[in-house]
């Protein structure tokens, strides 16, 4: 206790000032408390800073993660099962379609529907000309009088005619099933002089075989002649290709020929032409008689480019050149090693007999499907329709590879999902690849012939969908395809859509089913549905407009200074006039109508499959509501349906003024560009353009048969000062400000007047529909239907006879074909117009 009291006393004494006896403890403690307060505040700030820093780090990491997540979504596959099995194109499942003319970009060639195919093809040269013109890939610059399939059934055989100025080549192929690898096939190439040729031409045919990343090729050479190629690959097993001797057409006796061959490394298939060209040498002698010796051009040796990438995998290219004077024929045989029960060789009379049987079957099937003879078409027009159809189905290709894609989250383009694509193409010379909005039109015709092919094509396209529901609108899958495309068009952007025309084909499939769903069809539609749903949802989330039930195409050109009217490539109608100043306030009537069709088809599919359909039914009812459609898109001034946006009617292209500093002279390279001049500021209004876009509520049969707006459309269609011509409906009214106006200094009018067959098909189809619907305009529609159908058939056939081709578009003032050719993509819909099958 004493120690405790002493301790307390000492504590009390320590709190008393020795001089004045006052308690000074508070004065001594104040600084300590302030320090503690400051220390506490500092700790709070430090803690808060640490928390903020941690939150910032977490947010930064989350932002990076999310950006990376969004960046990778463009190349993330759709989670549903593929529509087509990975081996759906294999010889085990579809042996009859394993081999085919799946190389539309070359005049003649075959490959398999596989990832790494052995590739075969044909080149030719007319000898003793001032220039060496090597023909291989389909080129408009070759200026051939005509070329194309006359008959092709998509599976078994094809007959093609290629006209040069002095001779005609006929290329025929046929297949014979057997074994486990797709069986055998035979080519027959026939050369005949043109009647106008001054003498029978000497022609070199160059047959080639190339491996494309897989397989072994072994040449068999006798003297200077490559007589055969044997080989093997994982998908073909063992095989042999034999080059037979050229024969006289009449006697069938062997003809004199000179031979050359080439064996060369080939890094990629797009290099084949260049390799052959660089190997040509004019030192070889053609001497059918000792008195007539002439030097001709033949393949010799090929020296690869020095310092090529050592890591490059080189494939093998083998070329067999035979030089003969026309007329003659020559056969090439492919024989599968697994075809063990071959009773005879598939050549000569055996091949001829089988070819004739296929031709008769083709004629009979074509007549049974399209009934053109029954409709009164003469034989020459029936042959025309057969050729048009054959070029569509014979122009189908099989591609494998990756597109290059980019989203707003990717700084650089990325390789897209690797995969195959079995598809028709718009043009063998200019567009030898798949286009999304073209394909729906292509399959309207092909499905009439073979629904199995069309179902597979649709499956291939939808299997290219990513997790977002986006499908690249242009499929440029390999180096061979990329070699045909300008660099600025190679990269596909995932905010950009394309008209979902595959719904047109699916609509036709549902109509053909007529409510009778087979087990096979049900399985197919069930596989389609998850991807169709995602695709449909993608449009409704990425392409919506500023108002409910409105839509807007993304991807319009942003450099408004150089374009008279910024293009809308994504709509498929490229330079068709839209709002002059692109903005988020735009409403596009054509896209709204496409989504009306899509909603209807989705409703019908869900009904067939017994799935919930109310959402699609509600959307269809909203989009097909004529009063709401008119509220959003009817222009009282134009008396037509129209786009809406930030638009000026006073624009033109003018030479820009180049200011030259005082004391300096203008340089020669300072050419004044054509730039856009806006004389009146834009405002939100309807776009003053009457043309194809204005017709979409009619084209897709959304208008009620008794709608007064239908009468307006029919009257304006028939007006020669607007859309009507003796050759078909022009794309833009003559009264529209941008009719036949260039869009830039270098871009001629494209969808600003010329006649397009795909939209005219939709017009004829709609007229046929309204001519069968009870209403005040039924008779008017029937009259226009007959007149327009006749005009289209007459002009397109006339141009085919005169030029040898179907064309991308037709001049609205003369009817002449123009643009790329041959264009047997959607221009082939003329066959359905002839057959009145809509």
Task: Set out the residue ranges of the language-model regions.
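Asp/Glu-centered strand-loop micro-motifs enriched in Gly/Pro and often flanked by an aromatic residue
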Residues: 376-380, 394, 399-444
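Active-site acid/base region of carbohydrate-active enzymes
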Residues: 380-405, 449, 461, 465-471, ...
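Acidic/His metal-coordination segments adjacent to aromatic residues that form catalytic metal sites
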Residues: 418-428, 472-495, 559-587, 656-658, ...
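Catalytic cores of carbohydrate-active enzymes
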Residues: 536-556, 593-705, 786-825
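Aromatic (Trp/Tyr) and acidic
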Residues: 567-585, 650-723, 750-784, 817-838
């Amino acid at each position: 206790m004493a120690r405790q009291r002493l301790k307390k006393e000492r504590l009390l004494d320590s709190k008393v000032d020795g001089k004045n006896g006052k308690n000074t403890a508070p004065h001594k403690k104040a600084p300590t408390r302030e320090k503690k307060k400051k220390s506490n505040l500092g700790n709070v700030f430090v803690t808060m800073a640490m928390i903020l820093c941690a939150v910032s780090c977490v947010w930064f990491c989350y932002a990076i993660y999310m950006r990376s997540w969004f960046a990778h979504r463009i190349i993330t596959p759709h989670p549903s099962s593929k529509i087509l099995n990975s081996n759906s194109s294999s010889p085990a499942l579809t042996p009859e379609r394993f081999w085919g003319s799946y190389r539309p970009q070359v005049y003649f060639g075959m490959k398999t529907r596989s990832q790494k195919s052995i590739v075969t093809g044909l080149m030719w040269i007319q000898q003793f000309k001032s220039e060496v013109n090597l023909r291989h890939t389909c080129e408009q610059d070759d200026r051939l009088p005509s070329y194309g399939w006359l008959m092709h059934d998509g599976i078994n055989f094809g007959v093609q005619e290629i006209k040069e100025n002095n001779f005609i080549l006929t290329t025929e192929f046929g297949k014979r099933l057997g074994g486990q690898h797709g069986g055998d096939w035979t080519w027959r190439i026939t050369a005949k002089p043109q009647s106008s040729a001054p003498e029978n031409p000497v022609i070199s045919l160059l047959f080639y075989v190339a491996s494309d990343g897989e397989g072994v090729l072994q040449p068999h050479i006798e003297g200077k002649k490559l007589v055969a190629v044997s080989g093997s690959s994982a998908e073909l097993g063992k095989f042999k290709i034999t080059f037979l001797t050229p024969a006289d057409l009449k006697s069938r006796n062997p003809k004199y020929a000179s031979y050359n061959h080439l064996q060369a490394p080939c890094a990629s298939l797009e290099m084949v032409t260049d390799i052959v060209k660089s190997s040509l040498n004019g030192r070889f002698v053609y001497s059918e008689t000792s008195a007539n010796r002439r030097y001709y051009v033949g393949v010799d040796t090929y020296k690869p480019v020095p310092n090529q990438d050592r890591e490059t995998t080189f494939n093998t290219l083998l070329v067999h050149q035979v030089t003969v004077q026309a007329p003659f024929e020559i056969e090439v045989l492919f024989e599968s090693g697994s075809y063990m029960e071959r009773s005879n060789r598939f050549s000569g009379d055996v091949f001829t007999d089988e070819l004739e049987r296929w031709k008769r079957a083709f004629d009979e099937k074509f007549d049974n499907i399209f009934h053109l003879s029954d409709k009164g078409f003469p034989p020459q027009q029936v042959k025309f329709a057969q050729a048009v159809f054959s070029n569509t189905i014979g122009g189908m290709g099989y591609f494998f590879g990756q597109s290059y894609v980019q989203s707003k989250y990717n700084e650089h383009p990325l390789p897209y999902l690797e995969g195959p694509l079995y598809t028709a193409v718009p043009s063998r010379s200019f567009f030898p690849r798949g286009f999304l909005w073209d394909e729906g039109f292509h399959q309207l015709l092909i499905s009439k012939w073979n629904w199995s092919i069309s179902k597979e094509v649709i499956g291939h396209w939808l299997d290219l969908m990513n997790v977002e529901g986006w499908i690249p609108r242009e499929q440029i899958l390999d180096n061979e395809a990329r070699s045909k495309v300008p660099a600025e068009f190679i990269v596909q952007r995932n905010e950009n859509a394309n008209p979902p025309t595959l719904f047109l084909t699916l609509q036709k499939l549902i109509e053909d089913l007529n409510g009778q769903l087979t087990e096979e069809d049900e399985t197919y539609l069930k596989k389609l549905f998850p991807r169709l749903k995602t695709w449909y949802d993608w449009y409704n989330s990425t392409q919506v407009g500023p108002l409910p039930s409105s839509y807007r195409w993304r991807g319009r050109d942003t450099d408004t200074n150089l374009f008279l009217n910024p293009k809308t490539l994504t709509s498929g109608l490229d330079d068709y006039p839209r709002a002059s100043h692109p903005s988020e306030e735009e409403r596009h009537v054509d896209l709204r109508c496409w989504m009306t069709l899509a909603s209807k088809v989705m409703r019908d599919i869900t009904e067939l499959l017994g799935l919930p359909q109310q959402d699609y039914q509600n959307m269809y009812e909203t989009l097909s509501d004529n009063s709401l459609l008119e509220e959003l898109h009817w222009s009282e001034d134009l008396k037509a349906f129209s786009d809406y946006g930030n638009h000026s009617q006073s624009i033109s292209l003018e030479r820009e003024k180049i200011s030259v500093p005082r004391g300096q002279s203008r340089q020669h390279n300072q050419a004044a560009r054509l730039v856009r001049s806006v004389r009146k500021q834009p405002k939100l209004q309807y776009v003053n353009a009457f043309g194809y876009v204005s017709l979409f509520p009619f084209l897709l049969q959304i208008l009620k048969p008794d709608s007064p707006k239908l009468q307006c459309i029919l009257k304006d269609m028939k007006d020669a000062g607007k859309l009507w011509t003796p050759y078909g409906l022009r794309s833009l009214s003559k009264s529209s400000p941008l009719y036949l106006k260039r869009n830039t200094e270098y871009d001629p009018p494209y969808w600003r007047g010329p006649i397009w067959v795909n939209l005219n098909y939709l017009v004829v189809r709609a007229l046929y529909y309204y001519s069968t619907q009870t209403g005040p305009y039924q008779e008017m529609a029937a009259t226009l239907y007959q007149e327009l159908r006749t005009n289209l058939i007459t002009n397109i056939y006339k141009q085919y006879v005169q030029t040898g081709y179907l064309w991308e578009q037709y001049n609205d003032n003369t009817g002449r074909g123009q643009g790329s050719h041959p264009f047997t993509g959607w221009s082939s819909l003329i066959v359905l117009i002839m057959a009145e099958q809509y």
